[in-house]
Amino acid sequence: MSEERKLELPNDVEIASQTNSRDLVIISIPKMGKGSILGSFTSKYNALVFDLEKGGYEFIDARKISIYPTQDTTLGEAYGNYVKYRNLLLEQKGKYDYLIIDGLSDLDLMSSIGGTYLFMESVMGKTFNRSGGEKLKYGDKGFVLVENFLKDGGGYRWTREWFMQQIEIFKQIAPYRLFAAHISDKLIRDSQKDEVMGSEISLTGKLKTIFASKVTSLAKLIADGDKRYLNFEVMNDSIIAGSRNPKLTGKILISEKDKNGNIITHWDKIYN
């Protein structure tokens, strides 16, 4: 039995030593070059792209795994591939310093399946999605998603729980995580105007706020000609951006094209 650690109260101010964000979320509209920028990251750092989007990285050089090996892969098959890859990464946790999850909307989509299985394992759902005493699987005749079964949005509790469980699992796999996500428009209040258009993470319901509160830094990928910036500026009450890391503020150049049209990335401005 190990000796119990003695707790002591501090007398001095502790200087913060952490300089890199453990969780970085990059949000953008489609076709902004986010995949190419993240793919380039894997050539410079010990990183892996966990591609959850069908065809997301088929034209991008990267250290990557995809849950959609072909265009014919179904959502049910992709979910099975996701679980197998996730478990393999857990078995070899620490193999990569950085895990890139692209994208969050696809993980949210799979949460309908994962959340249903989670409910089926609960006391409340012990008879749900059964036939002859056997558990049904997604795609089987008679299989019902939990959000379509529980009334008044009760099913979303289970999909949210499964989603956040995956986020905690990713923390076990690698010390640093990068998440790619799409944006959706949001009408927000402004002190000068009644309503203005802002942006937020494209996730279901309360999940966008819950997830955003759990990560270190959020940035919106913006364009200026051939240059791409990570914008950490917080506008109004939008949850699109912000960072607990004092190093990540304002707009930071993340990529640009050289005279030959090659993309040059500047990840050293984000990670030491």
Regions found by a protein language model. Give the residues of each.
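Short, well-ordered beta-strand core segments
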Residues: 47, 177, 218-220
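Conserved GTP-binding G-domain of TRAFAC-class P-loop NTPases and closely related GTPase folds
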Residues: 185-272
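P-loop NTPase motor core
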Residues: 103-210
